[in-house]
Amino acid sequence: MRSKHVVLLVSVAGLAVTAGCRSNDTTGPNSGNTLDLSSLIGEMGMATLGASSGVAGVGAVGGFAVPAMPPVVPSTCQYSASIQGFTCAPFTSNGITVNATLFLLDAAGHFQSQPDAATTAAIRNVTDVQGTMKFDQSGTGGSVTLTSHQDLTLSGLLTDTHVLNGSSTSHSDLTVTGTSALHGVTDTKTVTANVTVSKSSRWPTAGTVTSDATTSSQIGSVSVAGTTHSVLTFNGSSVVTMTTTITTGSTPFSSTCKIDLSGAAVPVCN
């Protein structure tokens, strides 16, 4: 049981898909009179909330909270002809730096320099996160170094049903000092598949978010290595199902959790 706890402790929660940038530049895509890009980015975030932590807008590493980054504000991102996308100024908070780039595409897959409600068929959000955050909670200190790359595309914008697909990879290196000293390294890959957002439903009606993580940790003289496989399935309600299998050595441990994405209730697992 202790080894299972260790793997859970150092697993990395998915960083918010809406993590982005801030800038004083206002030459980016105008979402006010054409296409509501802020709303679409919000859809992309809602479609992945709870995939790892079960808490809307909050990430965690080793049980230590990672402050949620602000969402991308489309009007602050500047169009770059060289990449045919909108580059946002880097945003840094608590030692973590986020870089985001937005791409707009028509039905044929061609890049666009401005959003157009009549022709923009998809929005792509590429986010990179890197940095080291230090923490001190209840006498326990340490740091975590994070590196993450996420590439998500929301398509179907010319219809009433939008579909999110994409993937992300992340690497974390956690060091905790004090009475609960430990060192853990986790690598995670997450695949978002056909997460469907309907105009008539507040919550995604279908689709999955699948995560696979490998973890190695050291607590004192105890070394533990393991894997975690989880699948979150959307069904149109705020309460989604996440199945998880954690394996340390040859011993698997499985659980099924009901997660309320609205935050109205704590996750219930068995």
Regions found by a protein language model. Give the residues of each.
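Low-complexity, intrinsically disordered segments exposed to solvent
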Residues: R22-N270
